[in-house]
Design a protein with these regions (language model features):
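Active-site nucleophile loop of the alpha/beta-hydrolase fold
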Residues: 149-151, 170-179
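Alpha/beta-hydrolase fold nucleophile elbow
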Residues: 137-150
Length: 181
């Protein structure tokens, strides 16, 4: 178990928000086999609400130059060790640098109360993931996309509608739960 400090705190400078330090396991803890085609490591970043998010970063082995990147989250109630991690690892095998993240209030990420959803905060989680990816030296900030699975598909669409840095969006979902009254 390794303590990981939030790596993207630019927006927090000058604010009264203190990032939560998360303790993340560095062992392979996924529900799917580890690929021998990608490197994996745990990372954290902070959203504008001061919540520290836990993520798994997947990078193609022997990658050269600035890569296109993808942030993946969902489905609702799931964690990055499940389907979003599998999506991220599979996309990394195809040449993308990817992160699968636990949204606020879920899994290894911070936030109280636990196991709740907030469309505003969870949309911001995607934007915080873009902040993190765009600061990585091996990422082309002009080629960043997002994938929202199931209930997070609608949140991915929300994020893409308000954040012009997102150049591609996949909503792998049967409906947009954000439009339900």
């Amino acid at each position: 178990v390794v303590s990981v400090q939030a790596q993207n705190q630019k927006e927090m400078k000058g604010s009264n928000i203190k990032a939560q330090e998360l303790v993340l396991t560095q062992e392979w803890d996924k529900t799917f086999p580890q690929s021998n085609k990608v490197n994996h490591r745990k990372v954290t970043f902070v959203n504008r609400y001061g919540i520290t998010l836990a993520a798994d970063l997947y990078e193609p082995k022997d990658a050269k130059g600035a890569l296109a990147a993808i942030a993946v989250s969902g489905p609702f109630g799931a964690v990055k060790e499940q389907s979003s991690g599998l999506y991220a690892q599979t996309m990394a095998e195809q040449g993308f640098l990817t992160i699968a993240f636990d949204p606020s209030f879920t899994g290894e990420s911070g936030g109280e109360p636990r196991r709740v959803a907030s469309p505003d905060i969870n949309t911001e989680d995607f934007q915080a993931a873009i902040d993190f990816l765009s600061t990585q030296p091996n990422v082309d900030p002009e080629r960043i996309g997002i994938i929202g699975i199931c209930g997070w598909g609608g949140l991915a669409l929300n994020a893409a509608a308000i954040d012009t840095r997102i150049k591609a969006t996949v909503a792998s979902t049967m409906y947009n739960m954000n439009r339900v009254n």
